[in-house]
Amino acid sequence: MSFSKYLSTAPVIGTLTAFFLAGLLIEINRFNPDLLVYPF
């Protein structure tokens, strides 16, 4: 199985998406520490 075909499988895409969202939340919390505490 080729490497590019492996990168297009669902677990790899899901893992990359999870890492991207986690990093995004960390960066948002670094600049706006109380953003997730506000009651909506």
Swiss-Prot record:
**Gene Ontology biological-process entries:** photosynthesis
* InterPro entries, per database record: PSI_PsaJ (IPR002615), PSI_PsaJ_sf (IPR036062)
List residues traversing the bilayer: 6-26
- Where can this protein be found? Plastid, Cyanelle thylakoid membrane
One GO CC term of this entry? photosystem I
- Offer one Pfam family short name for this entry: PSI_PsaJ
UniProt KW keywords: Cyanelle, Membrane, Photosynthesis, Photosystem I, Plastid, Thylakoid, Transmembrane, Transmembrane helix
Q: How the protein sits in the membrane?
A: Single-pass membrane protein
Similarity comment: Belongs to the PsaJ family.
Q: Check the record and name the PANTHER family matching this protein.
A: PHOTOSYSTEM I REACTION CENTER SUBUNIT IX, PTHR36082
> What is the role of the protein in this entry?
May help in the organization of the PsaE and PsaF subunits.
The molecule here is called Photosystem I reaction center subunit IX
- Please give the organism: Cyanophora paradoxa
Q: What lineage is on file? A: Eukaryota, Glaucocystophyceae, Cyanophoraceae, Cyanophora
